[in-house]
């Protein structure tokens, strides 16, 4: 079928929520002491609504600012306008904010605001068509779903180029592999934290886990051993350094991880260093390298792909590009024989969008699901957090498959525009 992607925007509302948490989320560059969420709702002239989410984790005070960018910068250029597709709206928003991004020194927040609106528009289009979003995205790609496609999620060597047969998972039925991420290192106050969290998530059905590293070597290794033990035989392990090291330090740290059988090492270097540094590191890394959440724009992703230093590419739909920007990126990732594992660390609406993008595009990747407690994820994402044998099932309901329960989180709302 051919879906109608045209949309006339009648209304837009943006809301900010902040949920306090007992256990902060710790990274090598900062700490999250609450869980923020910026939700965008777009409504067309027929009363059909779509939902998106704007990345807003850092800096910790930035969520409300991003909401104001959506309302004050983007809404005036969208109100009452008709677009042939979300892609056209994305292109026009991106072009119209390009100079402002330079002048304000805020390319990131503006791109994140644009991404959130784009996500909402695609959800709207899919709901109106009566299709789950991943099916609508596949139709937009000109790739009707193959109902016979299937994939065993027990991947082999990550360096292997997928064949035509293996480059499809069971997303033909909306079922996608996932992994538990955001696992904090141990600490003096919580020495068994990583082990206990992984044990709980393993009992819930997760089979792959990613630990945050980039701290003292002894702490990294101690935490990783605890995670490995709690995960048990057959589990897949990954680590994320969150851009903690320069090349010299990374070269010294790589051998420490040689005996863990890691599926990938994520962001061992800053995302803005020359790709030549990544190529040097790749040559001696005991595991494939992963990056992409801090890459923005077609040219930047093309440079990443051309360097052939990264085997696992991790764009974030709420941080840059939405679906309009990321659909062609993911197509190029898969055509290059690399893995697309969408990055995501936020509320439930954005998580659903990331899962639908993975289901739409196929490949051998996994969806990232934050292992830490986050009511703004669990209250908003529904069944996508219900894991079985390392996979989740996306509903067949229209759009992202869920309507956010705003009443359940009303008391933690900090802003409505």
Regions found by a protein language model. Give the residues of each.
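Flexible C-terminal active-site loop/helix
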Residues: 4-19, 324, 328-329, 345-417
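Metal- or metallocofactor-binding catalytic centers and their adjacent structured scaffolds
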Residues: 6, 11, 43-128
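Conserved, mostly hydrophobic/aromatic
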Residues: 9, 40, 47, 74, ...
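Intrinsically disordered, low-complexity terminal tails and inter-domain linkers enriched
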Residues: 140-173
């Amino acid at each position: 079928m051919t879906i109608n992607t045209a949309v006339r925007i009648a209304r837009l509302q943006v809301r900010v929520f902040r949920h306090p948490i007992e256990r902060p989320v710790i990274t090598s560059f900062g700490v999250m002491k609450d869980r923020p969420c910026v939700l965008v709702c777009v409504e067309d002239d027929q009363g059909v609504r779509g939902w998106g989410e704007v990345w807003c984790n850092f800096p910790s005070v930035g969520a409300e600012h991003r909401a104001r960018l959506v309302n004050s910068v983007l809404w005036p250029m969208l109100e009452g306008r008709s677009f042939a597709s979300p892609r056209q709206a994305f292109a026009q928003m991106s072009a119209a904010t390009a100079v402002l991004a330079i002048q304000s020194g805020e390319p990131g927040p503006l791109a994140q605001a644009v991404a959130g609106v784009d996500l909402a528009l695609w959800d709207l289009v899919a709901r109106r068509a009566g299709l789950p979003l991943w099916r609508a995205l596949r139709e937009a790609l000109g790739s009707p779903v193959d109902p016979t496609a299937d994939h065993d999620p027990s991947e082999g060597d990550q360096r292997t180029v997928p064949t035509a047969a293996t480059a499809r998972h069971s997303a033909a039925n909306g079922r996608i592999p996932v992994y538990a991420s955001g696992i904090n290192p141990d600490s003096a106050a919580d020495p068994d934290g990583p082990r206990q969290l992984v044990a709980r998530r393993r009992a819930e059905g997760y089979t792959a886990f990613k630990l945050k590293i980039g701290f003292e070597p002894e702490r990294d290794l101690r935490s990783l051993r605890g995670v490995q033990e709690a995960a048990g035989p057959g589990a897949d392990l990954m680590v994320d350094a969150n851009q903690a090291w320069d090349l010299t330090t990374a070269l010294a740290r790589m051998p420490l991880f040689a005996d863990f059988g890691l599926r990938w090492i994520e962001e061992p270097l800053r995302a803005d260093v020359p790709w030549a540094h990544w190529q040097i590191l790749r040559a001696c890394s005991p595991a494939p390298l992963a990056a992409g959440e801090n890459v923005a724009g077609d040219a930047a992703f093309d440079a990443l792909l051309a360097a052939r230093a990264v085997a696992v590419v991790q764009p974030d739909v709420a941080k840059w590009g939405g679906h309009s920007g990321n659909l062609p990126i993911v197509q190029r990732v898969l055509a290059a024989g690399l893995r697309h594992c969408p990055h995501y660390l936020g509320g439930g609406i954005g998580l659903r969008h990331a899962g639908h993008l993975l289901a739409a595009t196929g490949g051998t990747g996994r969806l990232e699901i934050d292992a830490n407690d986050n009511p703004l994820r669990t209250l908003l994402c529904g069944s996508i957090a219900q894991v079985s044998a390392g996979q989740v099932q996306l509903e067949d309901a229209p759009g992202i498959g869920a309507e956010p329960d705003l009443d359940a989180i009303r008391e933690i709302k900090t802003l409505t525009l």
